[in-house]
Amino acid sequence: MKLVFCILSTLLGTFAYNPDHIAGTTPPYLVYLKSDYLPCTGVLIHPLWVVTSAHCNLPDLRVILGITNPADTTEHDVEVSDYEKMFRHPYFSVSSISYDLMLIKLRRGIKHSYYAKAVKLPQHTVPVNAMCSVSTWAYNLCDVTKEPDSLQTVNVSVISKAECHNAYKAFDIRENMICVGIVPGRRLPCKEVTAAPAVCNGVLYGILSYADGCVLRADVGIYASIFHYMPWIENIMKNN
């Protein structure tokens, strides 16, 4: 099936997992976290701070803003920064998707520009049925050994915890989680960069912890609810 999908995608000239996806420039808050292992997605929330999933605590991370195609080494208007320190949530465990959040303090502040701008943080929970933009990078399925080469965004809605539980019966969907996507997901080949953000009306409400499939094709994803972690986020930023 993967081979057929690869051939069709090559003929059509696209590797979009969802026909409703949006391709284009990188959202100014979106961060590509490059490592010697696997990349992750992050979000700029302050000139000195990036938030991502705790499972992205990977060796030799480099923080890259403004990049559309990580496989293109000639891309312009890209800003690269080293990090000073990582702060994983103290309750995070690799055996669970709970508390899957991490803050990264940059070595130097990112200058506000068209290509780099911090996203707003939430002051309340996100309502069910709210429309959100989920962005991350997709891999070319014909050669997943290379860097991902396609930035994509899909607009999907927040679903209820009951709907989410129906999609993920093996998981305990807690108050500090939100679920975004379509039930049920579509079982097509896909590979994307993990830790995609859910931004609703310009506000960051979620960071992806888990998805059985790919969020770029609108499969349901379980996200850390940023609002529920605001006390921890504010405390780390204030004291470091």
From Swiss-Prot:
Glycosylation sites: N155
Disulphide-bridged cysteine pairs: C40-C56, C132-C200, C164-C179, C190-C214
InterPro entries documented for this protein: Peptidase_S1_PA (IPR009003), Peptidase_S1_PA_chymotrypsin (IPR043504), Peptidase_S1A (IPR001314), Trypsin_dom (IPR001254)
GO molecular function: serine-type endopeptidase activity
Enzyme Commission number: 3.4.21.4
Origin organism lineage: Eukaryota, Metazoa, Chordata, Craniata, Vertebrata
Active site residues per record: H55, D100
GO cellular component: extracellular space; secretory granule
Organism annotation: Rattus norvegicus
Record's protein name: Putative inactive serine protease 58
SUPFAM superfamilies linked to this entry: Trypsin-like serine proteases (SSF50494)
Lineage: superkingdom: Eukaryota
Domain Peptidase S1, residue spans: 17-238
GO biological process per UniProt: protein maturation; proteolysis
Keywords: Disulfide bond, Glycoprotein, Hydrolase, Protease, Secreted, Serine protease, Signal
Subcellular location per the Swiss-Prot or TrEMBL entry: Secreted
